[in-house]
A protein has these predicted regions:
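OB-fold ssDNA-binding interfaces and closely related basic DNA-contact patches used
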Residues: 1-168, 282-284, 288-291
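Surface-exposed polar/charged interaction patches
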Residues: 18-21, 40, 199, 251-254, ...
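Non-transmembrane, interaction-prone segments in cytosolic or luminal domains
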Residues: 70-71, 76, 173-191, 246-260, ...
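Long, highly charged low-complexity segments enriched in Glu/Asp and Lys/Arg with interspersed Ser/Thr
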Residues: 100, 105-111, 218-287, 291
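Extended serine/threonine-enriched, polar tracts that run as long, contiguous segments within proteins
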Residues: 148-234
């Protein structure tokens, strides 16, 4: 691996860079084998007996967290996560192929990031856009569709976990990845991480308690994560945590290798097509010889 995947809790500055915490402290300048945390957008209904009558109830409430374990979806309204590291990327949903355009994952978003479509930043222009109103409508729409994403990797415990029928389940210290792409959720995680940074504490040394809050948009209801950094209890970093940290680092590198491979193939193809179009645009001109 290109980076030393060892947690040194006595070297905050170096570890803050490696784990991605420096992004918040400084102000925000392939198929996954990891379980993914998602938010349940709609309630899951079920039947329950109330006063001798069968009534429809919300077995799983909207806004609950969901993760897949052993082929089964598990839900909880509250979770406790231990963040080993975070990375940042851009992503955009491509409805034409029902898939995502994704960039490589980086320690921050201050540089142009190659994406798996052979471009950069999923099509977002480089640098700060000073006059958004001056852009074309198509460019505005493109930029709005691109999500700034905080990729969180760590372990999670689901509090009072159940399945979709309300049966008790157990998720304790389970490795996960979570792509937080809502604006408020992105900011909330940053605030919690910055709280650790202000106390010169690595995120892996503490838990975060996470719930969700409902938000309303035009004709739409959605949910955002609310994070609370728990500085009251310090967690030990032992050999098992070191091994898991190395696995997370390797997972990020695997994602980046895949994106770079896709970029290389599609960028070369794009360049070839552009050269062909340029060549075809030339018009042969007959030059008369002067006697």
């Amino acid at each position: 691996m290109s980076e030393l995947a060892v947690i040194d809790s006595n070297n905050y500055a170096a570890m803050a860079q490696m784990t991605g915490m420096a992004y918040d402290a400084e102000g925000g300048k392939n198929k996954s084998t990891l379980a993914r945390i998602k938010l349940q957008k709609k309630p899951i209904k079920g039947k329950a007996e109330v006063n001798g009558k069968n009534v429809t109830v919300d077995v799983v409430t909207a806004g609950s967290f969901m993760i897949e374990k052993d082929g089964k979806n598990v839900y909880a309204e509250n979770i406790k996560i231990r963040m080993f590291l975070q990375r940042f990327m851009y992503q955009k949903y491509d409805s034409t192929v029902n898939n995502y355009v994704k960039t490589v994952m980086a320690n921050d978003l201050d540089i142009d990031l190659k994406d798996n479509y052979g471009g950069f930043n999923c099509g977002k222009p480089s640098g700060y856009i000073q006059d958004f109103a001056a852009l074309t409508d198509s460019m505005k729409e493109l930029i709005r569709s691109i999500r700034r994403t905080r990729v969180v990797l760590g372990t999670v415990t689901f509090v009072d976990a159940t399945d979709e029928k309300g049966n008790t389940e157990e998720v304790v210290d389970m490795p996960f990845v979570w792509e937080v792409d809502s604006k408020e959720g992105f900011r909330n995680f940053g605030e919690a991480t910055n709280k650790f940074a202000k106390h010169q504490r690595l995120s892996v040394m503490h838990n975060m308690n996470v719930t969700t809050a409902e938000r309303e948009a035009v004709g739409n209801t959605y949910y955002v994560p609310i994070c609370e950094a728990d500085l009251g209890t310090t967690l030990e970093v032992n050999e098992s945590e070191q091994a898991l940290f190395a696995d997370f680092m390797a997972w990020v590198e695997s994602h980046n290798r895949w994106v770079l491979s896709e970029w290389e193939q599609k960028h070369v193809k794009k360049a070839s097509e552009e050269e062909k179009e340029l060549a075809e645009s030339f018009v042969d001109i007959d030059v008369e010889e002067v006697e």
